A protein has these predicted regions:
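Extracellular, repeat-based ectodomains that mediate carbohydrate processing or recognition
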Residues: 1-136
Length: 136
């Protein structure tokens, strides 16, 4: 079954998927990290793919607001997707935008020397019962 709708063998990575089936309407919902928008295959977005025909076809929706680079972030550590009543709820991790500052107390020079990319936990809600849901 093909979930993503970018060209076959495009070279773009899609990874760390999570699936949920809505028990009220039978829709199949898959959340995944997606690099199709970046020819260099580094910047990532979170995509929600939804099927209302038992998984025969999927419509893809850009779920995260802006693409991010996930280097040194904890992608996949905080991921979840659930669906009920025509609504899909998702949680995912993103690397913080450039310039985002985090302060922590480390121990010695080794702690200060480690590259650190702050990880942000995002929550998404897609309401397919509401009018106007649009795909990518």
């Amino acid at each position: 079954m093909r979930v993503n709708d970018d060209p076959v063998h495009s070279g773009a990575d899609q990874f760390l998927q999570w699936m949920s089936v809505d028990p009220t309407d039978g829709s199949v919902n898959v959340q995944f990290y997606d690099r199709r928008e970046d020819p260099a295959n580094r910047r990532t977005r979170v995509t929600l793919a939804r099927s209302t025909d038992g998984g025969k076809t999927f419509t893809n929706y850009a779920w995260s607001e802006v693409p991010f680079t996930g280097e040194n972030a904890f992608l996949g550590d905080y991921e979840w997707c659930s669906a009920y009543g025509g609504r899909v709820y998702g949680i995912w991790a993103e690397a913080a935008p450039e310039g985002y500052e985090v302060s922590s107390r480390g121990r010695g020079a080794a702690a200060a020397a480690r590259p650190r990319t702050p990880t942000i936990i995002r929550v998404g809600v897609a309401d397919f019962k509401a009018a106007g849901a649009t795909s990518r």
